[in-house]
Amino acid sequence: MSEFDNAIPTAFDPFAEANAEDSGAGTKDYVHVRVQQRNGRKSLTTVQGLKKDYSYNKILKDLKKEFCCNGTVVQDPELGQVIQLQGDQRKNVSSFLVQAGIVKKENIKIHGF
């Protein structure tokens, strides 16, 4: 029986490496810009993944003034601080973050529709 025990492979988890918290040189910190459909034609844009060094409230204030929309900063238990803006502001937010020098263009991921 011991010969067969050695021949049987152990359980392999293909997602173990993806779930591991590694801070290697290959990992990038992406900023995710998403749009969520609310009721009717209303939508909500969320910005997640900004560095903690930045003041979220100051960025929100500039975004609201630039795009003439309302917004708030929400504390999420899993995602941390998330900026929410009214309306579909995906392209506006991504161009604003690049022009302000907050994020590089290749580090922005736009999700939605």
Curated annotation (Swiss-Prot):
GO molecular function annotations of the record: translation initiation factor activity
InterPro entries named in the record: SUI1 (IPR001950), SUI1_dom_sf (IPR036877), SUI1_euk (IPR005874)
Domain of life: Eukaryota
Disulfide bonds: none
TM ranges: none
One GO biological process term: regulation of translation
Keywords tagged on the record: Protein biosynthesis, Translation regulation
Function: Probably involved in translation.
NCBIfam families with a match to the protein in the record: SUI1_MOF2
Annotated family: Belongs to the SUI1 family.
Protein name: Protein translation factor SUI1 homolog
